[in-house]
Amino acid sequence: MNIVALVDCNSFYASCETIFKPDLSKKPIVVLSNNDGCVIARSSEAKKLGIKMGVPFFEIKQIIKKYPVHVFSSNYSLYGNISSRVMGVLKEHCDRLEVYSIDEAFLILNKYSERSFVSRAEGIKKIIRKWIGIPVSIGIANNKTLSKVANHLAKKDELGSQVVEIINQKQIEISLKVLGVGDIWGIGARIEKFLQKNSIYTAYDLYKTDPRWVRQHLGVVGERTYRELHGEICIPIVERSEPKKQCRVSRSFESYVTSFHDLEKRIISYATRASEKIRSCLLYTSPSPRDLST
């Protein structure tokens, strides 16, 4: 059986900052972009205070005055180093590894019996926490899309093990019923609105949709996602991708952007995401130039 585990570091940048400041564990933390302009990472405690991703720093100063929020300038050298350590541990505990981003990786666990998948994942989680100091959530499923679903649920289980397995049909259907359609891996904001206009609100609604309708309206990519929700394997694990000549992060605006302030927030958010994608490509290479602090 092909088993995929998605390991995702919890609030990665904020967690990296607490490694050397353990007294800040469970405290609200935000990390700012290089010029300290916008928020690019938040601990779960900061999220609960209503601090949004990409918001300009000056807009949250009142929250910082009211609550003991700890603020850090981004330190990409540190984050890259910690990420490499996490990926190194993962590589030693799986059959195949795909580094998906600086804080996420897909693992293939083929060689282990089905009964050991959850216990194996819990063991990996404990090792990363003990050796490196980073908390992770792990989702286990038959393919990458469902492992993303499982990981989404695992992150919400803050008081539990944060390891969720959805292997059989019953587990899949229960999980999809509590997941919004926009939370499915590969479903962007535009497609989400289109699906909602067609009375498809949850992942389970899409799961139960006629496959011919999916192919007609969502194309090949949408059909691939649909098939993965049904347990098929359509998106392979890529251990070593071809060298990329460019990196792009783009979104279509729903309406005209007339405010420079709004445009600035979008640009910073997308530039930060593009930087993360580039850094993840360089984790196991000899980057040139070596200074990627921009």
Where are these regions (language model features)?
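Long, highly charged, low-complexity intrinsically disordered interaction regions
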Residues: R120, I124, I128-V178
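Catalytic palm subdomain of template-directed nucleic-acid polymerases
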Residues: L107-K125
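DNA-contacting surface of Y-family translesion DNA polymerases
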Residues: L6, Q196-S286
